[in-house]
Amino acid sequence: AGAQAIGANDLLAQVGAYYHDIGKLGKAGLYTENIQAQENPHDDLSPNMSALLITAHVKEGLSLGLLGKLPPAVTDIIQQHHGTSLVAFFHHKARVQNEAEKKRDGRPGLPSAPPINENDFRYPGPKPQTREAAIVMFADGLEAASRSLAKPTPAHIQDLVGDLIRGKIVDGQLDECGLTLAEIHRLREAFIFTLTSMFHSRIAY
């Protein structure tokens, strides 16, 4: 729906969406959509290691795409669908741990906590280079974020879509894809319509 709303290549966006996360296949248990609440493998890992493993699915996906001889336009989407986005959960977790270590640092004989390098918690990129790659970035982020909506009312869905798109703009993730502001607005409306339709049966008015 997003691609159609702005006259982008709808088929390419669909195929890119089908294949964008193939890099997760080898370690599926590490990702939120496959983790059971009682057994989270990240509980035993450092935030840095978790971020490294999570971001690796882009490189793994690109390798699988090339091995499977997918068209370059599709492997580009696999490589670009996270851009250089921040893995915010583990970056925040690392900062919390770092602050706790700093409070402890005043005690004799304990080493100083090393500073947090934000780049260690970012995807390698590149940023989306096409409108289709940006659409897959939006759709992927919204699919994940919408799962956390306890009450998917139209107002909450509008806020979710608006916040995600604004976040990508502020973070510079759309700087190289060629989307205009008018197209971004149309994409926002298309995603709001699609998500509202998907969650309609769950909304308690």
Protein language model regions, located:
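Long, hydrophobic alpha-helical segments that serve as membrane-spanning/inserting helices
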Residues: I169, L174-Y205
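Divalent metal-dependent catalytic cores for phosphoryl transfer on phosphate-bearing substrates
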Residues: A1-V161, G167-D171
